[in-house]
Amino acid sequence: MMRTEYCGAVTEALLEQTITITGWIHRRRDHGGVIFLDMRDRAGILQVVVDPDTPEAFVTADAARSEYVLKITGRVRKRYEGTENANMTSGNVELLAKEIVVLAKSETPPFPLNDENISVSEDLRLKYRYLDMRRPEMQERMVFRAKATSTIRRYLDDQGFLDVETPILTRATPEGARDYLVPSRTRPGNFFALPQSPQLFKQLLMVAGFDRYYQIAKCFRDEDLRADRQPEFTQVDIETSFLSEEDIMDINEGLIQNLFKTMLDVDLGKFPRMTYAEAMRDYASDKPDLRIPLKLIDVADLMQSVDFKVFAGPANDPKGRVAALRVPNGGSLTRKQIDEYTKYVGIYGARGLAYIKVNDASNINNGVDKESGLQSPIIKNMSDEVLVSLIERTGAQDGDIIFFGADKAKIVNDAMGALRVKIGLDMNMETCEWAPLWVVDFPMFEETDDGKWTSMHHPFTMPKGSVEELKNSPETALSIAYDMVLNGTEIGGGSLRINTVEMQRAVFDALGISEEEANEKFSFLLDALKFGAPPHGGLAFGLDRLIMLMVGASSIRDVIAFPKTKTADCPLTQAPAEVDSRQLRELGIRVREKAQAENKE
């Protein structure tokens, strides 16, 4: 073998032994005629000392530069007292070089690889991703991800799950996002679709009798990208038969508990449960961040008769919401800070951010002039009775501030839910480091802007109740679905699945999917349900997102080896790119040229 030890694995256990390492020069320093090389590999960094007593090695080291690839043989010795580095596994030892071989030279990298606070553009990092991943921070994240994936596999293997691969080339299905399409050469004019998830295939595996399935699956969605989205992403996909909703949740809760204990030595404890209705009422989000103790409080009933249309309008609108957010000690917020929060909620469609500062609540309760106890431009539009009720309901104390959201319920939820978290983080209100929970009892459907129904999760989710109940009241139907949330991020979602043709057709009907369309797109599933489909359900975790949270990265791009940009481009390979016209002809495809007007634009 070319080496006997990894750089980062050399410890005092190897003192006075002769070893061989290989790796890259992370840093090179000259001190008093002695050359110090910090040698790096994926296990870490080892300090190498090269002195003039070994002339050949010294000459080689003197000519070497950062990122040269070297093979070094030498003797492990203890560092001199006072030169130890407690931040490194190898920090108590160093290697006294006897022989150095240059395995590869390197040009000067386009950005420094030994700077922890790298300040280059993400596009440049992605263009030279193979260099970016040499940085210790990226190396640690990739190693962490690999070990986490192995931990997940071991847990599921021990639980009796089978790792089964499902097709990448499949057909388009309506799952809520655009498909990536792949033209067929053998059937011109027809297209495969890359899977948005293995959903239907894992259900068919249940019909086939493989009652415990899992897969670390690549999935593809052609959608607008954000910090936590990629066009291709990795999913821990799980499906089971003959288990209840509680059984499935317990297995997957155990998976995450085991993962955090193994990788971070963190005991997450039992996950609390919260219904969708409770989450939206108290936190204005179906993925609440429970580290933040702030809650929203509905006050629409108090605002129905106030002389303030901004509040009275939504308060009397069945689709409106008026919610208050009490921030303890928020009275210290400056006008500038409040203006910044007003701009922030505007991102989510809010047209403003009303507030009341509570200076002396007793003045209101005692009937003293309200303006001496409260500070806000809106209190002149409210009676003392309303203000007293408002203070009582929110539990506001002297020195607090109360923010208000009043609009269509969706706008209020989006804006105030985001504001709740932002204020909590800005004011360091987190009560713990990790806050997992289950959100359950989701609505089966949600209404679109044009008044139609769409699936809250996907059209194969089992509803609570009978077929007749679903047909009679689709608007109130709840699903047997469950999402796992961690620190305000949905890391996994699942449900029990429909296992009868009658219920599946009833759901298709509610979604406006005709029998003809259902037969065209899902005949294979409908046929399978006729042949004894067992009760089944499952869950899928977004692996990229989960790892991002665990390592404290700001984007999933930082935990994926070769990610795409926010515009779904790959700066490294320059993908997507034009292809040879011959290939297009073989596929029966002609690329339409842009109109002249478009070109001029």
UniProtKB/Swiss-Prot annotation:
L-aspartate binds at residues 175, 221, 457, 497. InterPro entries: Aa-tRNA-synt_II, aa-tRNA-synth_II, aa-tRNA-synth_II/BPL/LPL, Asp-tRNA-ligase_1, Asp-tRNA-ligase_1_N, Asp/Asn-tRNA-synth_IIb, AspRS_core, GAD-like_sf. Keywords: Aminoacyl-tRNA synthetase, ATP-binding, Cytoplasm, Ligase, Nucleotide-binding, Protein biosynthesis. It comes from Psychrobacter sp. (strain PRwf-1). It is found in: Cytoplasm. This is Aspartate--tRNA(Asp/Asn) ligase. The record marks 31, 82 as: Important for tRNA non-discrimination. Pfam families: GAD, tRNA-synt_2, tRNA_anti-codon. It is an enzyme of class 6 (ligase).
